[in-house]
Amino acid sequence: TKLLLKYYDPEDGEIDINGANLAEYTNSSVRRAIAYVPQNIELFSKTIYDNIRISRMDATLDEVKEAAKKADAHEFIRHLPLQYNTYLEEAGNGLSGGEKQRIALARAFLKDSNLYILDESTSNLDFATETLIFNMIYEQLADRSMLIVAHRLSTIRDCDLILVMDHGKIVERGNHEELMAKNGRYAELWNMQQGIFRKRKSEPAPQVPSAVVEEDDDGESITY
């Protein structure tokens, strides 16, 4: 992904986009054309409004709100003391992982690009939150191109083309059904991850001991 964003130049070969060598484009033009959501979200000591519109500084408050709604961020922002004028602590301390992720996605939606790169962007989230966010991503970006880097295969099951990499090399390619039929590396990883997920779902919830209530000599209740 860093090569696509021109943070580095390829040491060998070239990267073509729509038949044109990426090296022919300026760094700024490439980064303006791509919406990038990384694994580690960078939030600044500014208002939520400013943190979202950093991808497009001319955006109005209404446009920022619309992007936040698409990212399922508007509701939690609306319940903050100053809503979009709430000032964030350094690195977004005080927000949950899911809330940070929604702000990052709102940035991407506000940018309104033709190509979105999601680089392990939900790997720090729990399964339920990740599923919710990806369902929203697929709904909002159905008519855009997406490049998704992920280790949790459930998040890329519906992709048109899946490239399986091992030690830096592509070892398999195809959609989910094709790769499962090959019964290769992808199928092995899929079955392993699904087995872990089923095991977690079947594990009983931890038992919480019942409270014991007694009264002391003064008639006051004591809970153990």
Predicted feature locations:
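ABC-family ATPase nucleotide-binding domain "signature/switch" substructure
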Residues: 2-7, 31-43, 48-51, 65-71, ...
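Conserved A-loop
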Residues: 7-8, 17
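Conserved coupling/switch loops of ABC nucleotide-binding domains, chiefly the family-specific signature
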Residues: 11-14, 167
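Conserved ABC transporter NBD signature motif
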Residues: 13-20, 30
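Activation segment of ePK-like protein kinases, specifically the conserved APE
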Residues: 42, 56-57, 73, 194
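ABC-type ATPase nucleotide-binding domains, specifically the catalytic core motifs of the NBD
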Residues: 53-61
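C-terminal portion of ABC ATPase nucleotide-binding domains
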Residues: 70, 77-83, 135, 157-224
